[in-house]
């Protein structure tokens, strides 16, 4: 009987994957539309394990997608909207050439739009999954909110980015969930804990953003388009959870038209005023768990304690921001800590000479100081949040060289050089630093001095002395020698393969130790010269 | 005065003054003055009058009305239908005389203007922003009311066909384990601690140095190290060799010739004599003996192995144990390999598209640029750049690259008729 051979490329990787070109052909879409669709639906390319198989024998570097993903995309109703849009553009072109303004207006009124509600739910079946994807969304939206509008970046998109980010910041303030901040030269990093999820995002500095050339804006715009839809829902849910009105309301309840006014928007965006809460929702104060847990060194208890510290960080303080300070960042942090913020022209219009100001934030040399308030530089606010307590203000006075600003996101390893200030900060945060401290190598003067034993002078001539016991220290010496020998023997026993790794590890330990020692010595020297 | 008919002084030469006074024809001017005075006396000077005072716009048709084309009754009816005044209030049709069988017809429904009068304004569809709702607590699955279609399977099918309902989402695998936002290192702080800053900057400097080195290396590879370029002067000297213009012509003729001959003798290469040495009898014997010994040894080893194999029957238990162990080991290794593969997939960059991933350069400030306060900070790097790189690193975006141009491997043939061939026509003589 004749054998029936299986045809090549009818199973396995050849069928499981689909190249982008094939996908375009299947979906009848242009590359631009396909890219948009993939981003909106959250479908990403994959590198096949057997590239040659998937590529039907060729080794060219192509973009591959899972076939099942593409099949799934084919059912998407948005594809029809894309096609409608294509028709819309064609009609628009036609009418514009004919200069039929009436019809153009009518056409614009009936512009095809698509709705991303179902897609948001499909991609994030639970609220938690949406929260886990907030990092990207927030970072992009915060940046887009600062960009000028162009042909690709529509004004409406930038406005909604601004709106949604302000809303989110309001939520963080109201729920007092900001945990860490870090000012880097790239921008300011924030970390908040929302529903137990750590959300980290970056906000560029409040300067004109430089022009970027090698960024494909059309791609990012599509991402932002989806994130705007998602953030809207997330914000709504977050607001619902803590009993706030959505869209946010300040003071009295206002209606639709008034909310759209520029003045009202500015008020909301300034973050300076607290939001109105719904009457029908009971406000819960959860102080109980802390009492239940007690003063354990348990990690959870520690966390709860930290959260409570942050909530009452700036309670009862009134801050006045000088006009050169970054208002958004400072307002965000201070209000998160329960403080009150104001500046000239703010919604609450705090005057510089107001009597109830406790802290005045200044970022330039001052010559006229008032007596009954503390003057600090902006870094103090950031460092206070990271340290979870109000730091002494002496080192942050205007005109004083500031202490270094540490990143709260780095975790210290035992054996590294940790500056004295950082150790202090860690200790103040209630962390156990004994291990870190112990691992710091000691300088010569720190080591316990070996006391020279004063030998009793031997009497000259023949004499009789009491017999001496065998020296214990010598025994110890022998022991250490033996230990060393044993170690050496064990080192010899290591297989050749692992020997190299072992030695390289040893040298790095040694190097790190030396580095740390050197740095410590330097710091000591600097301190000594400063004191002298 | 008629032309050609001259009288009196006019008969004389036209060059003289006399002619100017007497012979000039002034009738035109006199006529014009007369006209003007007459106009002034009768109504007014026409030249000074405005258009409206003189002319009247003629509003009456001058030509006879064109006759209407003859129309059939049908055409006339159609014309009336399209030209009738639709703003006119329409009343119900006249009541039929005689027996009434049906109800009177209603007003035609499509009278838009009447509706407009009545106050029903049609507003163009505006894309209003819908208020947000709780997506996670609302059911978004499309439905069809039961009275329209009560067969659930049919409903399902219908919704799928009209793309209202989506098929099940394919299982989403986690694309990456990398964090979405990587926080900048401590050294990138706007007011960094000196040791952290040092560490951060030395790392960047090291990377930069490596880049410079690699660039230099490629440069070295591309450029020939000891390339000799013939200059124009050298070329000239070579061409002028032996000519009168050569600076060294006839200078030391003899010396050069001698040196040339000497060099010539040195350059000839001599091959060594080819020898063919044969092995002596002794050597042959030795070699044969060694070969024999080797063969014996091989045989002995084979024998030994066979014997050992035969003994293996008694240690099957041991062998089973060994095999089991080997299998177990292999399984452990394969598991580890799988784990590593997965980890690589989730943490490393995949090759997606033609382009190569370029790691973003970490921004840094020089020591003198670190102002130490927030007001004078000099922001570095761009967040969007970072975002883009992060998306690429997490395998969420393909990286495009230019397609390599293919060089033509075969050239096209072109048919050309040479002139000499073209010249040959019918009847031309072959020489």
UniProtKB/Swiss-Prot annotation, chain A:
One GO biological process term: maturation of 5.8S rRNA from tricistronic rRNA transcript (SSU-rRNA, 5.8S rRNA, LSU-rRNA)
Superkingdom of origin: Eukaryota
Xref: Gene3D superfamilies: BRCT domain
Keyword S-adenosyl-L-methionine: no
One MF term in the entry's GO annotations: RNA binding
BRCT domain span: 309-398
A Pfam short name: Pescadillo_N
Cell location: Nucleus, Nucleolus; Nucleus, Nucleoplasm
Cellular component, GO, one term: preribosome, large subunit precursor
SUPFAM superfamilies in the cross-refs: BRCT domain
Keywords noted in UniProt: Nucleus, Ribosome biogenesis, rRNA processing
Its biological purpose: Required for maturation of ribosomal RNAs and formation of the large ribosomal subunit.
Sequence similarity: Belongs to the pescadillo family.
Name the record gives this protein: Pescadillo homolog
Organism: Caenorhabditis briggsae
